[in-house]
């Protein structure tokens, strides 16, 4: 069977293959908000004491940051007193834990927001934080599938069989990591690592992308050609608040391109270098698959990480596989106690040896990556020493198939699966749907 062509936007972020060679379902996601259900899995149990009130939040079609901002306003408190373990998709029905510092449970009775349900779980001496999150359960409906329910079932069974045989799907970073409409974050990160802040700033502010609205493209093109930030502010839409903030900085501080990044929120400016690391990781993972090296059987030179108390891969505990340990390591991998990894390179990353190491160094050479560049002297908060990430997303989706009541004559399927934190549902769905990520929803 001919390998299926990967959409252009995925090639731009370093993904050039599917690991399954089965037919794609096509179809689309999120026709209704309830088609995408996400439930957080945490390791917390709440008690009766402590200064943090812990709640279960169920929200429909709400952005997490927008919700916490709105909640803080109603309660008349600082947004900093509200903590979550992870941000969730906006166009979805999501359930997660949140904590609020120093507030009475009775205050929650004030909250009457459309499509929001808050349930008091108890109190704690510590806030809800990222470390509490183990993973997420997903119940996802794919609609508008052209094949009949019987054909849809056959396609799903074939893909599922492939996924189970290979132990899961490649743990790629999906388009969300790079910007869905404008996959520019990794290019900005590359320029930063190369020490070229001027190029980085201009890419972020002024590089037009085909999928953007025409007036946005024209505004960006003008600034790209003229560097007239003052004039540019007149045409840049208000929704491009980050770009506008950077241009304002450059009007007041001409040529201070690294300083222009300091006006951005910390989580955004840190994302640039992380996205570049993710791009390199995706490239290395594709090359490993193309080379015919298994993702669930270690070879000599591989670096594996081990399972933590939550049963999740812990990249801080690693070991290099040798000829003496390869069989024992593969037994651990088979039982889900060890995981093969690939690098998110930085200034202090451990690299594999043997054939996996050759692949890693070859990609770094082809991309002309300077590891020292990840130590960003001009903007130390952007620096990254690097880490390693498991190459396989162990997943066993269950599915149901039926007629699509919203699209007469079409089929639908409901997929259920669990993923560890930091992984993307779309990474699983791409193997089943095989469509352009921008057309998925």
From Swiss-Prot:
The keyword Transcription does not apply. GO terms for biological process: pseudouridine synthesis; tRNA pseudouridine synthesis. GO terms for molecular function: pseudouridine synthase activity; RNA binding; tRNA pseudouridine(13) synthase activity. It comes from the Archaea. The active site is at residue 89. Keywords: Isomerase, tRNA processing. Gene3D superfamilies: 1.10.1510.30, 3.30.70.3160, TruD, catalytic domain. SUPFAM superfamilies: Pseudouridine synthase. Coiled coil: none annotated. It catalyses: uridine(13) in tRNA = pseudouridine(13) in tRNA. Pfam families: TruD. Could be responsible for synthesis of pseudouridine from uracil-13 in transfer RNAs. Belongs to the pseudouridine synthase TruD family. This is Probable tRNA pseudouridine synthase D. It comes from Methanosarcina acetivorans (strain ATCC 35395 / DSM 2834 / JCM 12185 / C2A). The lineage of its organism: Archaea, Methanobacteriati, Methanobacteriota, Stenosarchaea group, Methanomicrobia. The gene is truD.
């Amino acid at each position: 069977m001919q390998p299926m062509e990967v959409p252009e936007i995925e090639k731009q972020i370093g993904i050039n293959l599917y690991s399954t060679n089965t037919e794609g379902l096509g179809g689309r996601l999120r026709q209704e908000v309830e088609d995408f259900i996400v439930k957080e899995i945490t390791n917390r149990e709440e008690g009766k004491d402590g200064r943090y009130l812990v709640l279960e939040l169920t929200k429909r079609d709400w952005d997490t940051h927008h919700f916490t901002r709105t909640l803080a306003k109603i309660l008349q408190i600082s947004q900093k007193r509200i903590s979550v373990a992870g941000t969730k998709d906006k166009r979805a029905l999501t359930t997660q834990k949140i904590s609020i510092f120093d507030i009475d449970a009775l205050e929650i009775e004030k909250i009457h927001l459309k499509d929001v349900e808050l349930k008091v779980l108890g109190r704690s001496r510590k806030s809800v934080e990222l470390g509490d999150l183990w993973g997420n359960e997903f119940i996802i409906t794919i609609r508008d599938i052209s094949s009949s329910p019987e054909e849809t079932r056959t396609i799903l069974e074939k893909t599922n069989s492939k996924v189970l045989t290979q132990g899961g799907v490649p743990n790629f970073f999906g388009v969300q990591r790079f910007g869905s409409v404008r996959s520019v974050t990794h290019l900005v990160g590359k320029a930063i690592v190369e020490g070229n802040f001027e190029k980085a700033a201009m890419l972020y502010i002024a590089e037009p992308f085909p999928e953007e609205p025409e007036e946005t493209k024209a505004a960006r093109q003008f600034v790209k050609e003229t560097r007239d930030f003052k004039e540019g502010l007149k045409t840049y839409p208000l929704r491009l608040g980050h770009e506008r903030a950077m241009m304002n900085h450059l009007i007041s501080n001409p040529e201070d391109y690294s300083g222009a990044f300091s006006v951005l929120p910390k989580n955004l400016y840190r994302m640039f270098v992380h996205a570049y690391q993710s791009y390199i990781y995706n490239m290395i993972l594709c090359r490993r698959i193309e080379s015919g090296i298994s993702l669930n059987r270690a070879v000599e030179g591989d670096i594996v990480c081990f399972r933590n108390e939550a049963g999740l891969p812990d990249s801080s505990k690693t070991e290099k596989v040798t000829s003496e340990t390869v069989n024992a390591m593969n037994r651990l991998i088979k039982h889900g106690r060890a995981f093969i990894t690939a690098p998110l390179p930085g200034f202090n990353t451990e690299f594999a040896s043997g054939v996996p190491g050759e692949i890693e160094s070859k990609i770094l050479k082809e991309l002309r990556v300077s590891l020292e560049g990840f130590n960003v002297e001009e903007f130390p908060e952007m620096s990254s020493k690097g880490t390693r990430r498991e190459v396989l997303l162990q997943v066993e989706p269950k599915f149901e198939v039926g007629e699509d009541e919203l699209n007469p004559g079409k089929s639908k399927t409901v997929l259920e699966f669990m993923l560890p934190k930091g992984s993307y549902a779309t990474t699983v769905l791409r193997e089943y749907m095989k469509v352009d990520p921008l057309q998925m929803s």
